[in-house]
Amino acid sequence: ARELWNAGIIYGFGTDSDFPPQEALRRELAALGQFFSDQETFAILTKNAALAARRDDALGTLDRGKFADILILDGDPLTDIENVFNIRIVIKTGRIVVDNR
């Protein structure tokens, strides 16, 4: 996996697991963590997933003109990827749909 990444292969994240969603994500993150840094894993979960789905024109990064469903986390996933589970607020289509403040 590391050799392919270093050669420029783009990994994107996705799962069709029959585990409950959060458990599936934890397993995927554990597997990714064996080969990639937290910053690389975050890119795999976001912009690379959009690239893999050929939706990077509208998804994957916070840029003008793109859809911006946003998670506000209690912690920085770039320093500890497990922080993706510490969800404080979810904003979807401009509305707060989860508020754990």
Task: Give the label of every model feature segment.
Residues 1-74:
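His/Asp/Glu-enriched, well-ordered alpha-helical/loop segment
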Residues 90:
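Short aromatic-centered micro-motifs
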Residues 79:
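Small/polar (Gly/Ser/Thr/Ala-rich) solvent-exposed segments
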